[in-house]
């Protein structure tokens, strides 16, 4: 019984759940695919999901009186390095592409959480309960920070820091909204040995859900390949232009050939470059007593002296 062939693959979400505010999960099926396409499709989606989707995060911090990340703050339990690591984990979402500033000012004793961050209206917190620090004494913790939008993972820009004020502390930024991607390829899809399917599992940090991540990835992939639909035909110019017709009347003697190669061409009634143009590289080898070395002499002579390239394959004769 012949199986009905589906025109193209579709993407279907077969499982979706929110495990926590910062952990969204989804499982998707892409099918049907031709045998061998699954691993290609899976790899493309994995790379785009992890590397091409934008996210927002804190990329630098200013804390009054702190000049480097190995400092401590009186009355604050965490060292500055630990505070920076906690700020690095704060998950934000925004529709703006602009670099923005926020600040924090908390009087102790207090537990400092993400909800204490004072952010521009265009930036939202995914998990207001994310922990930042504990102020154990009657002191205040103050800071200003920068929020940027980007892709992938970005190491602290220490070169850029040289242009900052002394107390600006850069943070290695993890912009990726997708935290993990797995995929498997299953053959014999629908009982058809010529088809397979891809199952993709996606985990996100909650700034977008898994369905949004897949949708954004599809758009990225389409935008990458759609310009390639407009393939332009490039009309190849003839090997020798009309204005160069005089060039074709050059005698083979002027190609600086060996006596053996020259005599073979003469015996084959090849007297000018014009005569040579009716031969391919393979055709030359069929001339009596004309070996590969002689053919290479002719090819090199045409290229160096006249800029003419003989085609490699044998001409088809009607």
UniProtKB/Swiss-Prot annotation:
Q: Name one Pfam family in it.
A: RNA_pol_A_bac
Record region (Alpha N-terminal domain (alpha-NTD)): 1-232
What is the annotated localization of this protein? Plastid, Chloroplast
One MF annotation (Gene Ontology) recorded for this entry: DNA binding
Any one GO cellular component localisation term in the record = mitochondrion
What residue spans carry the region label Alpha C-terminal domain (alpha-CTD)? 246-318
Q: State any GO BP term from the record.
A: DNA-templated transcription
Which InterPro entries does the record associate with it?
A: DNA-dir_RNA_pol_insert (IPR011262), DNA-dir_RNA_pol_RpoA/D/Rpb3 (IPR011263), DNA-dir_RpoA (IPR011773), RBP11-like (IPR036603), RNAP_asu_C (IPR011260), RNApol_insert_sf (IPR036643)
The keyword Chloroplast belongs to this UniProt entry's keyword annotation: yes
For this UniProt record, give its keywords in alphabetical order, as a comma-separated list.
Chloroplast, DNA-directed RNA polymerase, Nucleotidyltransferase, Plastid, Transcription, Transferase
Name the enzyme's class: transferase
* Predominant location category: plastid
Which reaction is recorded as catalysed by this protein? RNA(n) + a ribonucleoside 5'-triphosphate = RNA(n+1) + diphosphate
Q: What is its EC number?
A: 2.7.7.6
Q: Which residues cross the membrane?
A: none
Query: What's said on domains?
Result: The N-terminal domain is essential for RNAP assembly and basal transcription, whereas the C-terminal domain is involved in interaction with transcriptional regulators and with upstream promoter elements.
Similarity-based family: Belongs to the RNA polymerase alpha chain family.
Q: Fill in the subunit field for this protein.
A: In plastids the minimal PEP RNA polymerase catalytic core is composed of four subunits: alpha, beta, beta', and beta''. When a (nuclear-encoded) sigma factor is associated with the core the holoenzyme is formed, which can initiate transcription.
Described function: DNA-dependent RNA polymerase catalyzes the transcription of DNA into RNA using the four ribonucleoside triphosphates as substrates.
- Protein known as: DNA-directed RNA polymerase subunit alpha
Origin species, per record, is: Chlorokybus atmophyticus (Soil alga)
Q: According to the entry, what is the taxonomic lineage of the organism? A: Eukaryota, Viridiplantae, Streptophyta, Chlorokybophyceae, Chlorokybales
């Amino acid at each position: 019984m012949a199986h009905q062939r589906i025109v193209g693959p579709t993407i279907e979400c077969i499982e979706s759940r929110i495990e926590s505010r910062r952990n969204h999960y989804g499982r998707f099926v892409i099918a049907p695919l031709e045998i061998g396409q699954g691993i290609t499709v899976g790899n493309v989606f994995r790379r785009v999901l992890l590397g091409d989707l934008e996210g927002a995060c804190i990329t630098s911090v200013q804390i009054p009186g702190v000049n480097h990340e190995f400092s401590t703050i009186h009355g604050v339990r965490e060292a500055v390095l630990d505070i920076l690591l906690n700020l690095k984990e704060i998950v934000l979402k925004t529709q703006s592409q602009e670099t923005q500033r926020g600040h924090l000012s908390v009087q102790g004793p207090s537990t400092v959480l993400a909800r204490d961050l004072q952010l521009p209206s265009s930036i939202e917190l995914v998990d207001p309960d994310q922990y930042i620090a504990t102020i154990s004494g009657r002191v205040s913790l103050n800071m200003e920070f920068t929020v940027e939008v980007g892709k992938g993972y970005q190491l602290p820009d220490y070169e850029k820091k040289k242009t900052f004020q002394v107390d600006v502390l850069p943070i290695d930024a993890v912009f990726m909204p997708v935290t993990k991607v797995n995929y498997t390829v299953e053959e014999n899809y629908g009982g058809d040995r010529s088809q397979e399917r891809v199952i993709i599992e996606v985990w996100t940090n909650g700034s977008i859900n898994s369905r949004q991540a897949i949708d954004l990835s599809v758009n990225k992939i389409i935008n990458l390949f759609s310009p390639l639909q407009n393939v332009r035909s490039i009309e190849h110019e003839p090997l020798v232009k009309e204005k160069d017709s005089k060039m074709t009347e050059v005698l083979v003697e002027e190609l600086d050939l060996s006596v053996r190669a020259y005599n073979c061409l003469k015996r084959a009634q090849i007297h000018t470059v014009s005569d040579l143009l009716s031969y391919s590289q393979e055709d030359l080898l069929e001339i009596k007593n004309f070996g590969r070395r002689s053919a290479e002499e002719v090819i090199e002579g045409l290229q160096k002296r006249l800029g003419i390239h003989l085609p490699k394959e044998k001409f088809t004769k009607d």
